[in-house]
Amino acid sequence: PDEKEKEILEEAAKRKIPVLKIYNKSDLQAGGNDGICVNSLDLSSRDRVLNELKARLLEICSDDFIKTPPILGDLVPQGGTIVMIVPIDYEAPKGRLIMPQVQSIRDALDFGQTVIVVKEDAYKAALENLKKQPDLVVCDSQVADKMAAETPIGIKCTTFSTLFARLKGDINLLAEGAGAIAALEDGDKVLIAEACTHHAVEDDIGKVKIPRWLKAKTGKDLQIDFAAGHDFPSELGRYKLVIQCGGCMFGRREILSRINKCKSAGVPVTNYGICISELKGVLERILEPFPAALEIYRGQKK
């Protein structure tokens, strides 16, 4: 391998990413004795070689690549009931639900569960009309405080973004990162990173609401930077906190890569939903379905 390829291999090793090496210039450099020699001119062996290559790829792939982990289906017994609270606001796309909501509904259906979808103003009535208490209530983070207030103690509840903190990232580390909000001081820099590159609408969650709630909660004069799409600062040490979106448009590996970069830089990191729940004072309730994350968060707050 040349120097650039060596860098890639070293980085893959650091991130514990399995690598399958394919040499396409064996006449220039020997590939070693542990590979499979193939004559590219021999068409009769093409299918056999490709099938063997696919088999090798499956061998080194992680389990979550082959089998997608559940979003919420494992939190509720089969045949259980889930209530989902879906606000329809300026940011909601016309004529459809957003991806995390759609994926969560599908996941629950795959696990044989019943899903009831309501707007926030119809939630209380829907709850009263149920003959049996639901096993789980999930809401958009923006109405987490309303959900927590209207949901009887004993019924587990969380947010879509918290579910995606577990699906796409490290929920324990993200819960711990939320504890850093209380320690922010005047002049501290905070990075808000969003996977989407959409144009900000009125009262945009990332560019308007979170900064407003953050400053109101802390009472501090914070410097807030924004990053969108695949742009992510390489120098993270200047930040006291990174707030990453739920990552529904990114794969798990990319979100984990960002989390690991923050961890390496010693910078606390959390995500939109967990951050918003902390700012609204209901994070302990939202983390109830995830005991390990709840314990870590409580430890950070002490």
Where are these regions (language model features)?
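G-domain G4 guanine-recognition motif of GTPases
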Residues: 1, 19-49, 85-93, 118-121, ...
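Conserved C-terminal guanine-recognition region of P-loop GTPase G domains, centered on the G4
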Residues: 1-44, 57, 69-74, 97-129, ...
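Ser/Thr/Gly-rich flexible loops in soluble cytosolic domains mediating phosphotransfer, phosphorylation
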Residues: 19, 23, 27-31, 35-64, ...
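Short, charged N-terminal beta->alpha structural module
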Residues: 52-53, 84, 90-108, 191-219
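Conserved beta-strand elements of the Class I
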Residues: 81-83, 189-191, 243
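Flexible loop/N-cap segments at domain edges
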Residues: 137
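Redox- and metal-dependent alpha/beta enzyme cores, enriched for Fe-S-associated oxidoreductases
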Residues: 164-221, 227-231, 236
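Cofactor-cradling patches in redox/metallo enzymes
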Residues: 229, 239, 244-280, 286-287
